[in-house]
Amino acid sequence: MKILVVGDVVGNPGRKTLYAYLEKMGDKYDFIIVNGENSAGGFGITTKIADEFFSKKIDVITSGNHIWDKKEIYTYLEASDRLLRPLNYPKGTTPGKGYTVVESRKGVKVGVISAQ
């Protein structure tokens, strides 16, 4: 199984570069993980961008401290098990979760942990 892990995608230029790469090479991978905490202009991630990532066959979005920069994402974090906050942030005081298990395109379950 081939897994692509992409570090910090920053702003629109980072998203455009990622999408261009995935357009050419995306089918080569069975599972794609992207750090999206700075994908909204270098500060946080929006629900629109998260949905955009998932539409590009990105399986899980990880994050760090900048996940909190856009308050609109808080509800999305609670509802999604594919957008992760850092695991080592206090449970109960921060929305979402820091780990997930998602089935790959090959039918293999993949565990992902987001820690900062």
Model-inferred region functions:
Residues 1-116:
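Acidic, metal/ion-coordinating pockets
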